Amino acid sequence: MQTKRVLAGVLTSTLLLGACPAALAADYNDSSLTGGSAAWQAWVDGWDVLAADFTQVSLTPGADETQLNFAWYSKDADGAATPVVHFGTDRNNLAPFEGTSAAVDSSLTNGEAYSYNHVTVTGLQANTTYYYTVEKSGTETEVQTYTTGDFESAQILYVGDPQIGASKGQPQNGEELVADSGAANTAARNDGFAWDRTLDIATAQNPGLDFVISAGDQVNKTGQAKEEEYAGYLAPDALASLPVATTIGNHDSLNPD
């Protein structure tokens, strides 16, 4: 364990409106204008499926650099929860790490039964590429890649207010973005795309990031279950290999999700 750590922070903004002054241009956070027409259309085409997918995997930093935490939901209709992560340097010979699972309050998931799964992987080494899958009701996901840094320094991406769903009421293509439930939450659709694009740009400009610190407000809806906002938050491909240490913001704090 290194006793001296040098932290290199990278500041970024998700540009998801939040508390932006009203004087800003109406299209300031309009993903249909900022992200490229083909990429935006692909996101829109996939939104119905994405908004209903509550089983995406969340990576968070472990207690130290030798550990990595995984969390995800699994749908009970697909079988009993199997809180297992398969992890290792040989993608054809991954070691199982078992964790814990328990029922999710079904009022958060449109009345459908889900279980949460928590697993901690240990024994990570510096400057090493690993491969992993997670089990969702006994079925392994496709293989993902995770690479550690040198353990003597850490490059951190600091973000504020991803706040998926915060653009409600803003104009887009002649209509107002709304925060309705499920795929009808067009504000979450807009902001999820912007968050995905922000992380793509940030990781391209800052290769070698070790993890992200989010200062809070991962989602926007306060006091009500809005799993589609979390689906948009967890959707970016970058998050399959980039852990996030989240702070509970005021919007998150009243949300039982």
Show the residue positions of the predicted features.
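Sec/Tat signal peptide C-region and signal peptidase I cleavage site
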Residues: 21-25
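Divalent metal-dependent phosphoesterase catalytic cores across multiple superfamilies
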Residues: 28-247, 253-257
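Hydrophobic core
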Residues: 11, 15-19
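A periodicity- and composition-biased signal for non-globular, repetitive helical segments
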Residues: 10-11, 169
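Bacterial Sec-dependent N-terminal signal peptides
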Residues: 1-10
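Generic signature of intrinsically disordered, low-complexity, basic-rich segments
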Residues: 4, 18-19, 98
